[in-house]
Amino acid sequence: MILDDEEDILTLYSNFLSSLGHRILSSYVNADSILQDIDIEPPDIYIIDYRLPNNMNGVEVAIEILKKFPSALIIFITGYEMLEKELSKHDIFCDKRIDVLIKPIKLNRIQDSLLSLLSK
């Protein structure tokens, strides 16, 4: 599952990962939508942007995901350079398989992160 507030970024990530043989279950532009569908079919990995519209950010979404699926794999892709420091403030992220990619990134970095998390 991919969560980013920019539809063109969702399309870019989806097309790239699909071209590498990954199946994208769904993509979302806001936190409310992904949380409504959280029980439908848990993905192998979540790709989440930090800055989101409305009232939740990516960390808050990830917390809800980890409450439901403690072993979920999460990649944050963000321009927010202090994200790792923010994650360290929440015990729920301790000993989890999480990666933080700081924008701008090359697309192959997403694939590298995904493969690294899946192999842990």
Q: Predicted regions span which residues?
A:
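Short amphipathic alpha-helix used as the core "switch/output" element in two-component signaling
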Residues: 59-70, 90-91
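C-terminal output helix
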Residues: 102-118
